[in-house]
């Protein structure tokens, strides 16, 4: 309010992150957006950027949240502060996911570092149970392609992505059926499985 000089009832807090990728490199001269304060990239290979987002941002979430939740954590920020979960995430993202992204390694690493900044944002309380919704289809879309590419490249199962599959199975092990969902148990407390 002090900065604007008036009260904006619709003003909301947002993450300080932006990435614009435009899928036509010939537009770079016509749209001088690189001179703006926002990061804008023009490319003829838009699919690689979509894959980077799905594999690194969404894949990191999907591969981390179920094991972290079952270990007693509730929010992404807690995961980033927990030394064991953080080390596991580092090894997953930089050791198993980034090598499968079809972009120069420095671009994928920079994107992953920006994702980490978002995960560490103390103003965003991103609940692990919210991220867990529809985890089977999310794992299939966000993690399985990386899993397969890693296996094809190395001839070995990617250890931490394999662990994320085991966590998925453990999370979906229900103790009872609810009205519209299954009910799981974590350290004596129940949670809804959607």
Task: Label every PLM stretch briefly.
Residues 1-194:
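Substrate/ligand-engaging "lid" and interaction regions
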